[in-house]
Amino acid sequence: LCAAPRPVRDPNLMNAKHLFVSAALIAPVLAAFVLPGEKVRFAPAEGTSATKNFENKMELTLDHMAITMNGQEMPGMPEMDMTITHTQKVGVTDEFVAMGDGQPKKLKRHFDALSSESSMSMKMEMMGQSNDQDHSSEAESELDGKTVVFTWDGEAKEFKKAFDPAEDKADLLKGLMEDMDLRALLPENEVKVGDEWTIDVKSLVDVLAPGGDLSFKPKEKEGGGMGMGMGMGQGMGSMHDYLSDLLEGEAKAKLGDVREEDGAKLAVIKVTIKIASQKDMSDLVKDAMKDQEMPQGMEIEFDHMDVDFKMEGEGELVWNMKTNQIASFELSTRCVWLEIQYA
């Protein structure tokens, strides 16, 4: 599983200044000239805008498949090779209308471009017969080209969401998340090169699935499409749904370097994650099945689907120390374990 969000780099960056202290100074004097920590914070200026482009890529390969009946694994299963790939691209432009402490008070987000593509390649051999199948699908979102305003409600401790101009499509707003700035990866206090801090694992949902549920739907209904990646963003829930708030494990960040590049001051943050999640996806699948067109004479009775996965990854966040926003981010992950059980 690979996820590589790539926000646009900002060329308007601050020149760096470094302070050097002689090691020969006596202790009391040295204490007065300790190098200050870096303020790696999210604080864009009010009225400014930022364009961000994310690209998430995922590849799954089948390791083992079994069918059980009355608790017993059925013999004579065919040999099967299967690979599923999924690519999602998200482009937005955020206008920071009003800023609060560490987050916007009011944010206007325009969805510039939303696209999703999936493909599946399967080869099955049984009783000397070979059957090869290749499928591909695309998904789109009604949010594409629209503008959503996020307004912080201090009493409710949440963002209120509304279309601009107003539209009666509340279902599209329900799963949207305001944070597409990767704020979960930033330190709470000043840090020096080499300092580490712990990342709230549950907050990684906004990093792995930026923007929340973007309401992708298949462009065309495909008969028998149940197997197309188990609906990863193609009509059976988004990656945000699969992760939700059930993430467990650990995640750490480290200030690896503060450097100058083309006259810019950049903070380089190294990120490592080891996470796991268990999710009952039954309700999402049942809702998706209502819209599935089955071949004539075919009926499917669905009981449940559970997803269990473990993931490890490393990444690098480069932070613009002048505009106090993302310069770039790349995260590579791999599934140590992914099990899907359904009946």
Regions found by a protein language model. Name each.
Residues 4, 24, 118-120:
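Serine/proline-rich low-complexity intrinsically disordered segments, especially terminal tails, linkers
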